[in-house]
Amino acid sequence: MSKQRDKGRIYEKRRAKFQELQKKIGITFQNEKLLIQAFTHSSYVNEHRRRFHEDNERLEFLGDAVLELTVSQYLFQKFPHMSEGQLTKLRAAIVCEPSLVKFANALSFGELVLLGKGEELTGGRTRPALLADVFEAFIGALYLDQGMDVVLRFLGQTMFPKIDEGAFSHVMDFKSQLQELVQRDGSGTLEYAILEEKGPAHNKEFVARVALNGQELGVGVGRSKKEAEQHAAQMALETLRAADKQ
């Protein structure tokens, strides 16, 4: 009887955690079993064969495809002047394992994962590959339960703002994008200049400007001249995009 009571407490505690997650993200699953499945590792299923559990591997497969599509759509619309090669490179950086782990950790997904005892003892709860898989499985479950619009809304709260904030700017060659745009339009010559160097030698900060035919398009700041020029080019692209919309 006490074992049953213990199991009941564990179940209720687990259910409360999943309800807390739903409240946190502002989404209520119609089928909560799908949500729990997204966090169920194969090691847990192997140790609980008497009760029917399904692991998250199929949901992970689906979520991977949904992420590829949604991120591709977002980048296609967000960066109209970016080449196919650059879009592919940026998407790869966004959906790679280290990035997905960061998104999973931001939502404390590791605390919700159902693991077998062996996997738990070997640190599975914080294993990067496992957390990335759980994030993909969650996206798969969300898609099945709520549809694409809700997936896009969720990513609009968690993933897309990071893109807008420049979290992946290290793989984005803004100077090349700007050069291609100017060449395509035949609008003139780009010139970069370092306006200012600030700070001590070990912690320099550079301010760069990019101009088109002598007219300033953007100013950027960076820890190196190259980084400052990239940020200036990024600002220039945003200026030109805003002008296109008017």
Curated annotation (Swiss-Prot):
Cellular component GO terms, alphabetical: cytoplasm
Subcellular location: Cytoplasm
HAMAP family on file: RNase_III
Protein name in the entry: Ribonuclease 3
Keywords: Cytoplasm, Endonuclease, Hydrolase, Magnesium, Metal-binding, mRNA processing, Nuclease, RNA-binding, rRNA processing, rRNA-binding, tRNA processing
DRBM domain ranges (all copies): 173-242
All residue ranges annotated as the RNase III domain in the record: 18-147
GO BP annotations, alphabetical order: mRNA processing; regulation of gene expression; rRNA processing; tRNA processing
Annotated Mg(2+) binding sites: E60, D133, E136
NCBIfam families: RNaseIII
Subunit field text: Homodimer.
Described purpose of this protein according to its UniProt entry: Digests double-stranded RNA. Involved in the processing of primary rRNA transcript to yield the immediate precursors to the large and small rRNAs (23S and 16S). Processes some mRNAs, and tRNAs when they are encoded in the rRNA operon. Processes pre-crRNA and tracrRNA of type II CRISPR loci if present in the organism.
Main subcellular location of this protein, as a coarse class: cytoplasm
SMART domains, A to Z: DSRM (SM00358), RIBOc (SM00535)
